[in-house]
């Protein structure tokens, strides 16, 4: 059976005005994935925290390097 190490990172928009902008968050995460180079994304999980400024979504990306 093959196995590999799964890695992850979480990302959100800056707190305050625009923190609930999901399209901006998706673009931000896409840019982060591209900067990592050759990776295979396994899963994306969206979370939403409720703050005094309103909803604050974040995404956790689970991935592995394709060179591993």
Language model: regions and residue ranges:
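N-terminal acidic leader/helix
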Residues: 1-36
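Short, charge-rich amphipathic interface segments used for partner binding and complex assembly
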Residues: 28-68
